Amino acid sequence: MKYSKKWSSLFLASALTLSTFSIAQPQVQAAEVEKPTKPTNVIMLVMDGSSNNAVTLSRWYKGGNLAMDEILSGGVRTYSAESAITDSAPAATALATGHKSNDKFVGVLPATVSSPGLEQVAKEDAFKPVANVLEGAKQQGKATGLIATSEIQHATPAGFSAHATNRSQYDNIAEQQVYQNIDVVLGGGSESLTPGTTKNARKDGENLVNVLNEKNYDFVKTRDELLNSTSSKIWGSFAPSALAYDLDRAKTRPTEPTLAEMTGKAIDTLKKDEDGFFLFVEGSKVDWAAHKNDTIGIISDILSFDDAVKEAVDFAKEDGNTMVIAVTDHGNSGITMGNANTSSTYSSIPVSAYIDPLKKATMTVEGALSQLKEDKSNLVEVAALYGLDDLTEDELATLKSAKDIGDEMVKMLANRANIGYTTGGHTGEDVFLYSYGPSKITGLVENTDLAHSMAQFMGFDLNKLTDDLYIPATKAFKDKGYTTKIDLADKENPKFIAQKDDVTFTIPVNKNTLIYEDASTKTTKTHTFDTINVYNGTEFYVSKKVLNVIK
């Protein structure tokens, strides 16, 4: 595998040279790795779809410093293998595996590499699964955790826990997450765990909640159940899809935990492992609010994310051997303090002109619209929940006739608060890097650098890990004289089959098992391995340890 091979030698030699994937980049320095005196921990926090300007606005809104301010250490370049502006799936892949990838790809190598300065991927390696830092932590014997305020199967948490050629493959992602045996998993997405008729319900007929119970997880559904759990294995599924925005929670879903509460509980649970832990945390819905240009939603969940960062940093300060990284995966919306209203008067406009209109809102646009009656008879009251408490006749008429009321509401509030937006999509700027603890990263780095820094701190090499965890099953069995096929009779449950004489091996998709059958002795045995079986549409990939059971 040629892609990203530079990292193997660079990181084994030193912890100094970063920005491997770009042409004419300045050399970036990372602190030399300190030899740990006790097990290492890593807490990786991602504020999805935020931007530097959004953080600035949130600080003004809060009226004081953010927890993130204390650990600001550099910047991150976010482009993907094919674009200056990345999607969340390749961004997560970069942060988790050290490989830039393509739009919609989760934890697999790209098929197209066109961004300047990147090495091409060998044709046979396109779509190949690549190991992530959570999988590496597991191999080191560490406890692992995964948290998100979106569905836990969403692109960014998926990038740290699964491998799929399209981020929309929730069935595959959910099943892989269950069979990864992650110790603590907290977020939304319960509908992808069981069969049903809803959009993201399972189509393969498998009930993963039953599997979790068989694996002795404490399966919790509410804040109180989570906080009262004493189990070392917790799966918290608090909503069918995403959790509520932080600002809306008290009124719309009071039984859901906050991001900070989930983070604190995960740390308290994982820290008991004598080998240390890896924890991934995502504040997911900053991105969703930015796509809508919902200023209140952006601020709501940046501040919620900041509370989670405080939980992580407070623990790291006490522990002394925990690396904390906080970052956004990409910009979104082009939000600015200042718009066409301020073009000639910006130098005399006080902070209050931006913040006071925003302070009137008590809910995000999503939360406010959840209170709208079907006949829209309470439209004025709903607008007031979003801070629009003094609608003009023209504004009210606009809302009444709007095809998308929320779209008009966010425009009105942004105009009153002098907030500008350039897009409803992602943006390509460099973003802030926040880091704390041993081997703190500084300077302007690539998103891929963060994965390699975390891996090195925990004591493994990601490229070697990929070679151990994901080998092509076809070659492995054919080299031993087996005939092989991929059985697609059940399209929702592909399986790899290898046969020789009376022996048959069956490898189910997304699980961590292999079934051995010998017809001559009527023997059947199930082997369990250290990683999941991944099917990328053309090939099955399995752990190298499978070679130990092939006769």
Question: What is each stretch, according to the model?
Answer:
Residues T40-N41, S50-V55, W60-T93, N102, ...:
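A post-motif C-terminal structural segment
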Residues S9, A13-T20:
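Secretory targeting and sorting signals
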Residues L18-E34:
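Sec-dependent signal peptide cleavage junction
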Residues K100-E175, N181:
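Extracytoplasmic mature domains of secreted/periplasmic and thylakoid-lumen proteins
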Residues L12, Q29-P36, A84, A92, ...:
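Cofactor-binding active-site loop characterized by glycine-rich and histidine/acidic residues
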Residues M1-F11:
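Bacterial N-terminal signal peptides that target proteins for export
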Residues K38-T40, M44-G49, N53-A54, R59, ...:
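Active-site-adjacent structural elements in enzyme catalytic domains
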